[in-house]
């Protein structure tokens, strides 16, 4: 028998056949200490769970596709959670967005297999880094671009970029067992 902590666990884990969902979100991470819940900083996951608690009446255990560091943004981030209740999936996105801060948005939701896990189902990640080649910061992109003041040697950068083209095995950079 499982013990429930008030305001923490979702009762669907104990009493009902659970339904697993894949929720796609986007967020600007400037105001957050990353995705994963931490005791000393606001996090994206905690904000999502707060919204879920208000909409679903329980706080599901959320599994993100990846961890992100403080200040990192995500245009399309997958997370999975289980829930059985009265709120239909087609109403969840709009309802979550009504309770999420404006820098986090729910995009779409799909029912998935019960054993689906967002982290283990992720097969690829795409990272984008933006460089602003200017003497002065742009007030609209200062927190999403790295400003480089001196003129860049574009030809040298293109030559260096050629070395990245193709498929590469970065398994040696992964944590053991991941």
Predicted segments with their positions:
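Short Gly/Ser/Thr- and charged-rich N-terminal loops/segments
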Residues: 5
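Structured-RNA-binding interfaces characteristic of tRNA pseudouridine synthases
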Residues: 13-178
């Amino acid at each position: 028998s499982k013990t429930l902590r008030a305001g923490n666990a979702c009762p669907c884990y104990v009493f009902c056949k659970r339904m697993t969902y894949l929720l796609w979100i986007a967020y600007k991470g400037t105001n957050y200490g990353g995705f994963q819940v931490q005791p000393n900083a606001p996090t994206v996951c905690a904000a999502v769970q707060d919204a879920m608690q208000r909409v679903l009446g329980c706080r599901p255990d959320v599994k993100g596709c990846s961890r992100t560091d403080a200040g990192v943004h995500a245009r399309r981030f997958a997370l999975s959670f289980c829930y059985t209740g009265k709120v239909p999936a087609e109403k969840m996105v709009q309802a979550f967005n009504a309770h999420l801060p404006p820098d986090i948005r729910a995009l779409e939701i799909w029912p998935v297999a019960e054993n689906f896990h967002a982290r283990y189902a992720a097969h690829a990640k795409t990272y984008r880094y933006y460089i602003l080649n200017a003497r002065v910061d742009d007030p609209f992109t200062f927190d999403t671009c790295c400003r480089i003041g001196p003129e860049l040697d574009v030809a040298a950068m293109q030559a260096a970029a050629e070395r990245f083209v193709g498929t590469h095995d970065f398994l040696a950079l992964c944590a053991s067992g991941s």
